[in-house]
Amino acid sequence: MANDKKKLTVNDIKNKKIKGEPIVMMTAYDALFAKIFNDYADIILVGDSLNMSFHLKKETISATMEMMLYHTNAVCAGAKSSFILADMPFGSYSDERSALKNAMKFFKQTEADAVKIEGGMKNVAIIKRLCEEGISVMGHIGLMPQFSKFEGGFKIKGRDETEVKRLMDEAKAIEQAGAFAILLEGTINSVAKQISDSVSVPVIGIGSGADVDGQVLVWSDMLGFFEDFKPKFAKRYLNGAELVRQSVQTYANEVKNRIFPSEEFSYKG
């Protein structure tokens, strides 16, 4: 498919909520897949999820700035019109100074359009500071993978009134701090709708039901390449791992049986 999309901006993303147009967001970690996704994704997230689904670690927290910068550059090389969102890895925004320093690296060393930061009230001041410096920020609340060790696993949010109030307060505070959008993960559907209705910026869900302003999935979950773990919310549109496995097996068999390369794939003198 030829790409005739114009480069999407922060205003384009925000206007989609105003127009009632669902936002399509997905992850990518390399140029090859980013180039394919570019034709369909409004936002491509270079997520620290790559630590699990690309580097096969057990969690996201050991992802480094060097790793995220490398993969963000790769994605930017492949996707020329999608809005590129880079994840700030665990430990890279523990205070305003380090957050500003590391966010600047994404803007100076890659072509990222914005950064994403996990955390509620404790990171509102950091989000505000980055926005004041001209760095576009997407907040991330609800289930936060970077807190998985602290919380003893991946916990669904919005199960009681106290938690619902906290999430609502966090969303409003993040909006007021200047964030252009909010990622809401692993949150009860009805609560996600309340949050989306309570703020003017887009709320993009993952595992948070349909009543938000857009959806994001990890590409290797969506296309069936990551077989170690399948989240309940991740619909598989393809059994990619099995298709690749069959193709590689066929190639290996053809080499072993001297079927490949045939004359069709050989140079003649």
From Swiss-Prot:
Catalytic activity: 3-methyl-2-oxobutanoate + (6R)-5,10-methylene-5,6,7,8-tetrahydrofolate + H2O = 2-dehydropantoate + (6S)-5,6,7,8-tetrahydrofolate
Listed Gene3D superfamilies: Phosphoenolpyruvate-binding domains
The protein's name in its UniProt record: 3-methyl-2-oxobutanoate hydroxymethyltransferase
Pfam families linked to this entry: Pantoate_transf
Complex formation: Homodecamer; pentamer of dimers.
Native organism: Campylobacter curvus (strain 525.92)
Keyword Metal-binding: yes
Subcellular location: Cytoplasm
Family: Belongs to the PanB family.
Top enzyme category: transferase
Keyword check for Heme: no
Name of the gene: panB
Gene Ontology biological-process entries: pantothenate biosynthetic process
Catalytic residues, chain numbering: E185
UniProt cofactor(s): Mg(2+)
Single GO term (MF): magnesium ion binding
Annotated cofactor note: Binds 1 Mg(2+) ion per subunit.
Keywords: Cytoplasm, Magnesium, Metal-binding, Pantothenate biosynthesis, Transferase
Lineage: Bacteria, Pseudomonadati, Campylobacterota, Epsilonproteobacteria, Campylobacterales
